[in-house]
UniProtKB/Swiss-Prot annotation:
InterPro entries: MoaC, MoaC_bact/euk, MoaC_sf, MoCo_biosynth_MoaA/MoaC, Mopterin_CF_biosynth-C_dom. NCBIfam families: moaC, PRK09364.1. Its EC number is 4.6.1.17. Pathway: Cofactor biosynthesis; molybdopterin biosynthesis. It comes from the Bacteria. Homohexamer; trimer of dimers. This is Cyclic pyranopterin monophosphate synthase. Substrate binds at residues 75-77, 114-115. Belongs to the MoaC family. It catalyses: (8S)-3',8-cyclo-7,8-dihydroguanosine 5'-triphosphate = cyclic pyranopterin phosphate + diphosphate. GO terms for biological process: Mo-molybdopterin cofactor biosynthetic process.
Length: 158
């Protein structure tokens, strides 16, 4: 499948018609990360950030973003998502980096890759927003699709 599906015969943007696609369970896992300094790391793990629980707020922001993906990505279908999970893992072997995993699931006619990517991205952006007073030099990314399952194109694993 090397054809772009979001364009009509005139080369204009369109939202793909999925009404003929079969309903199936679809899952997507996206990942992102943010590199922070030691002060931010210590604030987060000790719950000492002045704006509150950084990871708790970021987790809720990521869930909200995944739920609202069709409002910010023009050709995404509004979906009834059956589950969203966002988890965090620290790597302090070479600095301070938070790895973000966003898993999204639905039963429907189109996939949830964009919802997972949007959720992971918004989570990282929220961590940045809540800690930028300490250091604006944080680095976000890479952000990428790790896995998807369901649908006619089958599974994808990075």
């Amino acid at each position: 499948m090397n054809q772009l599906t979001h364009f009509n015969e005139q080369g204009r943007a369109k939202m793909v018609d999925v009404s003929d696609k079969s309903v199936s369970t679809r899952t997507a896992v996206a990942k992102s990360s943010i590199k922070v300094n030691e002060v931010i790391h210590d604030q987060i793990i000790n719950h000492k950030n002045k704006k509150g629980d950084v990871l708790g707020v970021a987790q809720v922001a990521g869930i909200m973003a995944a739920k609202n993906t069709s409002q910010i990505i023009p050709m995404c279908h509004p979906l009834n998502l059956s589950g969203i999970d966002i988890s965090f893992e620290w790597d302090i072997s070479d600095g301070y980096e938070i790895f973000i995993t966003c898993t999204v699931k639905t039963t429907g006619q189109t996939g949830v890759e964009m919802e997972a990517l949007t959720g992971a991205s918004a989570t990282a952006l929220t961590i940045y927003d809540m800690t930028k007073a300490v250091d604006k030099g944080m680095i976000i990314g890479p952000t990428y699709l790790e896995h998807k399952s369901g649908g006619k194109n089958g599974d994808f694993n990075r």
